A protein has these predicted regions:
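Flexible "arm" and connector segments at domain edges
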Residues: 1-211
Length: 211
């Protein structure tokens, strides 16, 4: 029966005032159930650098799977939606692991939440006619640029401090373009809220059920 549990097994919760902040809050609450270490402790360590890169990889992999499903068969849009929301969960988790809260993102972008939401919509409008391949390339490119600012890598013998301002600023820019890729398809703000809410409930259920 557990294998049958998915986003269609739940209903979305009521609409919050600030959808993006609510997504961050819900992800942080979920993470408390399985993270044994305090997240965002020190991104200068090799361990946390590796975790951040790992979640970037998960984010892009799920996005690629969603886009691939769309390219193969548009009738599989429900499958694509679930993969995209999985990607969003990994993405927000990566930001929180990096100690980059929504408030910090707004600070690095030098604006407020309402303006950011409008910026995302404006960017989405500019790329709405792009191919699936181009959208994925956009998301992947900015992920790699941001994570390349993490100085600690296994192949390096010397561990160096990360330029946090550069890493956070470029990750904040990735945040804008990543969500713009979602909005450029059919996942507008309301749809994103609905699907994230359902998937978040799925994940809580799976953790509670030891799935």
């Amino acid at each position: 029966m557990l294998d049958m549990v998915n986003i269609n097994s739940f209903t979305s919760e009521e609409t919050p005032t600030d959808i993006i902040q609510t997504i961050f809050d819900k992800q942080a609450e979920l993470m408390k159930k399985y993270w044994t270490k305090p997240v965002g402790e020190d991104i200068d360590t090799l361990f946390w650098s590796q975790e951040i890169r790992k979640f970037s990889k998960y984010t892009v992999e799920e996005l690629a799977e969603a886009y691939q499903a769309m390219e193969m068969d548009w009738s599989r849009w429900e499958h694509s939606e679930e993969e995209m929301i999985d990607s969003l969960h990994f993405f927000i988790e990566k930001l929180l692991i990096a100690n980059l809260t929504y408030k910090k993102i707004l600070g690095y972008l030098g604006t407020d939440s309402e303006h950011v939401r409008n910026l995302i919509k404006e960017k989405a409008e500019k790329i709405k006619d792009w191919s699936i391949e181009s959208l994925l390339r956009l998301a992947t490119y900015h992920s790699n640029i941001a994570d390349n600012r993490l100085r600690n890598k296994e192949r390096k013998s010397e561990q160096l401090p990360t330029n946090r301002d550069l890493f956070y600023k470029e990750t904040a820019e990735w945040f804008l373009k990543y969500l713009a890729c979602f909005y450029s398809l059919w996942l507008n703000e309301d749809k994103l809220r609905e699907l994230y809410s359902k998937k978040n409930q799925v994940n809580h259920f799976r953790i509670k059920s030891n799935y």
